[in-house]
Every structure is written in C-alpha cells, then in structure tokens.
Amino acid sequence: MPLIIRIWALLEKINNMAFSKEEIAQRIAKEIKDGFYVNLGIGIPTLVANYIPKGINVVLQSENGLLGMGPFPFEGEEDADLINAGKQTITTLPGSSIFDSAMSFGMIRAQKVDLTILGAMEVSEHGDIANWKIPGKMVKGMGGAMDLVASAKNIIVAMQHVNKAGESKLLAKCTLPLTGVNCIKKIVTELAVLDVLPEGGFKLLERAPGVSVEFIRQSTAGKLIVEGEIPEMKLD
C-alpha cells in the first residue's frame, strides 16, 4: 500500500476516535462548578450551554447582554429576538436578565465572571492566545475576547488541535496577532485535555479514547509534558 494511502487511512482512523465539537463542549461542562457565572465565547463554547451537569446552579452570560442563558431551542421553537454573541438563537431560563452590552462588559471588566470559555486559532505553551484575526482576511472588529482575557479569573479554551492544513494550533509561540498573553489555564481539544503550566508547557491530563500519547505529541508543536499513565477522557 502506498505511503500516502497509509497516512490517509491513519488520519481517518484518528478522526473517528477523536471527539466531536459537541463532545469537546460536553467535556468542558464538567469543569463548571456550582454557583459559577460563566461566559461562553463564539464557536464551540456556545455548545457548552447544552451540557450543564444536572444538580448544579450555574448562570451563563453572553457578552451581548444576557444573564441566564439556556440551551439551544428545539427546531420550530426559535425566537429570533433571543440570540447569543455568535448570533445563534438561544433560550432563557427563569430569572434571566437582558441588558445592554455596556453593562455586560462592565461585569466582565469588574471580574464578576468566574469562568470564561473561548475558542482559539492558536495557543502558546506560555498561555498566550490568538483568536481574533488572520492577517489578510477581513474582520469586522476585535470583538469582546480582549476584554475577557484581560479580566477573567479562569479561562478554558475549546479548540481543534490542528488546523485544516494539519498544522498544530498548540505552539511554542503564537504566529497570529495576540488577543492576550499568559492567560490561558486549560485547553480541551478533540484529542486531549491539557493544562498550561505557569513555567511554560502543555501538561497532558487526558486523551481521547483510542488516541495515543504519541499521536498527541506529534500533533503538538509546543512543549508537551507527559507524566505517568494518561487516562482517557470521559463524558459522564
């Protein structure tokens, strides 16, 4: 069998083992504690609203001006006047509050949010994040991520481990314009759960079922730290 076909077959096998975007969100939801106020960024983070563990009281914030965001609506039950920061239709929970974005960012800058979950294009081994611009591509603006990374107490990144070209997004140093520096604490990808250590480096905590540590190592351009046996990621 030609080498290129063997490589393609291996990648297909890994893709089948790796977590979906929904499963990434479900794994991140396990990090949420009772009583938390949580900001959900655009992309994969918005899916977390569908997987809040039962039995805990959590208030989800959307930066466009909402406290008490619920899961996505069922088909046919959408209300076009209720959207999140990513312009997706949402639901609200009893006791929810709607207000202007100035008040929303006042909450963020005053560090009233316990946990922020963001998407990213790149994260460095020192916790730097790039998630707002790819040079040469038109963007409407920076968005709210820079306020969040400057003010949040705890930030988890939900992202794909590699880009569409198969290049790692977990780097020694970010190549894209930065959103914030030394601010990311944890990363969840389709392949792994990793801590970003204060001294630098990605510490591997969990791996997707069927995905080897060696494959994660090959998919990580920054410093990967592996200690002992690495358990598989669990969703329940």
Segment roles from a protein language model:
Residues 12-16:
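Intrinsically disordered, low-complexity polyampholyte segments enriched for Lys and acidic residues
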Residues 17-93:
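N-terminal active-site beta-alpha-beta segment that forms phosphate/nucleotide-binding
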Residues 19-23, 74-236:
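Conserved phosphate- and dinucleotide-binding cores of soluble alpha/beta proteins
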